Regions:
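Extended alpha-helical "rod" scaffolds
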Residues: 1-324
């Protein structure tokens, strides 16, 4: 019965999310999904805590021959509660990225990114959601959610850079530097301590690549490669997008990179383990939408804005916002 109930929770959450993200008209989107997911995530974590307490209390009270079975049953129930809570967090992250999908279509395009501040709009949207989530989610759940949200956000940002058809230099490098500051401020708002420094380290390295001349770009690239792996497909796409480098310039840099990689026997994955670039390299250009799940929207993206508005309305009601 317990497993059936847990399966029903998982299925219901997923069905409601799919129902709202596949609606063809905004009026088909019903409110309350975010509220439901937050409440369910908190409830399932509390149930897991109670299950663990019960396990500790009972394990020494039952006959020794039954302890293994009791532990197994309670462990399974506990894991089921945690799975549901985690699934709710994933859907809450999906809702944020769903809201951002139209903005990411403008990333690194002219004039939206260069002049209108696409990244600023994205960071403000994420900040708004993060404040709402932090106010209502259990702190442990928010810690998991914020980590996942930022990882997926940065992966989407770097994947958009890789897909860019043209980077107008030097304005692109200047705008990228501004983006680093905006993303760093967002990370500092969402995460503790000095985490922003480590998370944007890769962005600073890429900024150095964008800011270097064709004759000097190999040096910052090699610094990047030693920390994050060769990522030749990524670097080739970025260099080819730069409108101040011609085909011969790019070819020369890539040949130098390949030669140095062979000489140094540089592994694809750094010794310290996978970094954010591992997620970027695994995302093929044709599968960019996978970062945002397989969503379908109505004409002109009406469903995107409708779901986002529904989420914000429910979070803003009855003291859900910090500033309410």
């Amino acid at each position: 019965v317990m497993h059936q109930t847990q399966a029903t929770w998982m299925r219901t959450a997923q069905q409601e999310f799919k129902k709202q993200t596949t609606a063809k008209q905004p009026e088909e989107v019903n409110g309350g999904l975010v509220e439901y997911l937050i409440a369910l995530a908190n409830d399932q974590l509390a149930s897991a805590d109670q299950c663990e307490q019960l396990l500790h209390r009972l394990v020494n009270q039952v006959p020794s021959e039954n302890r293994g079975r009791v532990r197994e049953l309670l462990d399974n129930a506990l894991n089921g509660f945690l799975d549901i809570s985690k699934h709710c967090l994933q859907l809450l992250v999906d809702i944020v990225l769903f809201d951002l999908r139209p903005a990411f279509k403008d990333m690194f395009t002219f004039p939206a990114w260069y002049i209108e501040g696409t990244t600023a709009m994205i960071t403000e949207t994420v900040r708004d959601y993060a404040g709402d989530y932090a106010a209502r989610l259990d702190p442990n759940l928010y810690d998991v959610l914020s980590d996942d949200l930022l990882t997926r956000l940065l992966a989407a940002y770097l994947t958009a850079l890789r897909r860019s058809a043209r980077l107008r230099m030097p304005k692109a490098a200047e705008r990228f530097g501004v983006d680093i500051s905006e993303l760093s401020n967002l990370i500092s708002f969402m995460r503790p301590g000095d985490e922003a420094t480590s998370r944007v380290e890769v962005l600073h390295m890429i900024h150095a690549i964008l800011s270097s001349s064709s004759s000097m770009v190999f040096l910052p690239y090699w610094t990047f490669a030693k920390a994050h792996g060769p990522n030749l497909a990524f670097i080739e796409a970025v260099l080819r997008a730069r409108d101040d480098m011609d085909k011969n310039d790019v070819t020369a840099v890539l040949e130098s990179a390949k030669r140095k990689i062979r000489q140094e026997n540089l592994p694809d994955v750094p010794e310290g383990g996978p970094t954010i670039m591992s997620a970027v390299s695994q995302t093929q250009a044709s599968a960019f939408s996978n970062l945002f799940s397989n969503w379908h929207a109505g004409p002109d993206g009406d469903t995107w804005s409708a779901l986002a508005q529904s989420a914000q309305n429910y979070l803003g009601a009855a003291g859900w916002r910090r500033d309410a």
